Regions:
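Beta-strand-turn-beta hairpins that frame and shape the catalytic cleft
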Residues: 1-4, 111-120, 167-171, 207-209
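Core catalytic region of metal-dependent phosphoesterases/phosphodiesterases
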Residues: 2-100
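Catalytic metal-binding/acid-base residues of hydrolase active sites
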Residues: 10, 36, 61-62, 125-127, ...
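Active-site-proximal segments of metal-dependent phosphoesterases and phosphodiesterases across multiple
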Residues: 78-82, 115-148, 183, 224
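Conserved hydrophobic/aromatic beta-strand scaffold that supports enzyme active sites
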Residues: 109-111, 121, 164, 198-200
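Anionic-ligand binding region
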Residues: 139-165, 170-175
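Acidic, His/Gly-rich catalytic cores of divalent-metal-dependent hydrolytic chemistry
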Residues: 165-242
């Protein structure tokens, strides 16, 4: 059995479409949330996911959009904060009531079972879609996060960074971000690489194989989508894509 795991599309349908041929090879696809906000194609991405009928987790950005709330961006420098608020306002204007209803139907967690595989999916953690599970999260904190859980594998997004780490006899997996990945450049800046990140889990008997994948796509196609969308501060949004 082959399961593709995607997360954090963030309204970048160009990135999602670049991996679609690979996703179609999987027996199942699970989306870990944050599908529409902060990108150029929020409505189009939701429409695609509605048609795809993949099970989706409720990310923190999905919950905010579904309830017409706003992020505070309190930790963001003022100039960038104003641009993000403007982008959120634009995103709200781009989606409709049906889109919000669709987002509201996302689940906080999803259990996937197949053969001997038991997989628990969430956005941030099983207990909160804003909690971060990092490569450096202490084992004792993981014990609290996964208390009462007994899955062979756990999969979450939110941090926009790929990860596989052992936790007891289980694996904790983060597929990274399809539409808004980032890494620290040599000068310390956070930059967005033009690739789509995802994970593929393959089960055979008792064995579980995890592949963290990255697929490059066209920066020109992304730029064209951003300009065509009419999103505010488009050049600012594009400046860190490399």
């Amino acid at each position: 059995m082959k399961i593709a795991i995607i997360s954090d599309i963030h309204g970048n349908l160009v990135a999602l479409q670049s991996i679609l041929s690979e996703l179609k090879k999987a027996d199942r696809v699970v989306c870990l949330g944050d599908v529409a906000a902060v990108g150029p194609q929020p409505h189009e991405t939701i429409a695609f996911l509605r048609k795809a009928r993949w099970p989706c987790i409720l990310g923190n950005a999905d919950e905010t959009l579904a309830n017409s709330k706003r992020e505070s961006y309190a930790q963001i420098p003022e100039g960038d904060r104003e641009k993000l608020v403007s982008l959120d306002e634009w995103t709200e204007s781009e989606i409709d009531a049906a889109d919000r209803e669709f987002l509201s139907g996302f689940k906080p967690t999803i259990e996937v079972k197949g053969g001997k595989l038991s997989l628990l999916c969430y956005h941030g953690s099983p207990r909160s879609n804003t909690e971060q599970i990092l490569p450096t999260t202490p084992e004792e904190e993981l014990d609290r996060i996964f208390e009462g859980k007994n899955a062979q594998a756990y999969a979450g997004g939110h941090i926009h960074s790929q990860m596989v780490r052992k936790f007891g006899t289980s694996l904790i997996i983060n597929p990274g971000s399809v539409g808004l990945p980032f890494f620290k450049a040599s000068d310390g800046r956070a930059v967005n690489p033009v690739w789509a990140e995802y994970a593929v889990l393959t089960t055979s008997g008792d064995d579980l194989k995890v592949e963290l994948r990255r697929e490059k796509y066209s920066k020109r196609n992304l730029r064209d989508a951003v300009i065509e969308s009419g999103m505010p501060d488009s050049e600012w949004w594009l400046r860190d894509w490399v």
